[in-house]
Amino acid sequence: MAAGPRTSVLLAFGLLCLPWPQDVGAFPAMPLSSLFANAVLRAQHLHQLAADTYKEFERAYIPEGQRYSIQNAQAAFCFSETIPAPTGKDEAQQRSDMELLRFSLLLIQSWLGPVQLLSRVFTNSLVFGTSDRVYEKLRDLEEGIQALMRELEDGSPRAGQILKQTYDKFDTNLRSDDALLKNYGLLSCFKKDLHKAETYLRVMKCRRFVESSCAF
């Protein structure tokens, strides 16, 4: 009998709850396919969380008539644009797994500081009650990417810190128009960067483990 939606949800939840292996030489070792599955699920969850947060913040604070012009002004705002990383799936497929993991790690680490104030921006719980857990979720994904890097270590030189700048922290003064625009821009970059990290992880998973979900 084919697995139903409930089975799929339970499986996904189970994978999200699995801990990352702290020692790759420990027994029993987690299969590489499971490491990738865990990382992809976590990245998808964070990307969706970021997209939902952006939309709800926009709906609550940004007048509809101003959204398009503000979004255009945000086009070159993200510091992550200074990273020579692939901009989409096709470009990502031209890079090695280790390169994609390093880019993913840089993107995740650039947000560890800024998101620590994210829960204060959403004191009224605009879209989700777990905004105070975003930092922990990012650290969890960081740990998963590092576990994959240990597994796939190929002896190539480690990349230095490419990101020269990082993001400002979210502003909790929501009575200021400047603060609102700053937070709106940060949420836009957060969404874009997590989409990149998710894309890189999915490309790696798909080319190592051919599956029907590779079409994305």
From Swiss-Prot:
Residues modified as Phosphoserine: S131
SUPFAM superfamilies: 4-helical cytokines
Entry keyword annotation includes Disulfide bond: yes
GO molecular function terms attached to this record: growth factor activity; growth hormone receptor binding; hormone activity; metal ion binding
UniProt cross-references to InterPro entries, sorted A to Z: 4_helix_cytokine-like_core (IPR009079), Somatotropin (IPR034975), Somatotropin/Prolactin (IPR001400), Somatotropin_CS (IPR018116)
Cysteine-cysteine disulfides: C78-C189, C206-C214
Keywords attached to this entry: Disulfide bond, Hormone, Metal-binding, Phosphoprotein, Secreted, Signal, Zinc
Record function comment: Plays an important role in growth control. Its major role in stimulating body growth is to stimulate the liver and other tissues to secrete IGF1. It stimulates both the differentiation and proliferation of myoblasts. It also stimulates amino acid uptake and protein synthesis in muscle and other tissues.
Name of the molecule in the record: Somatotropin
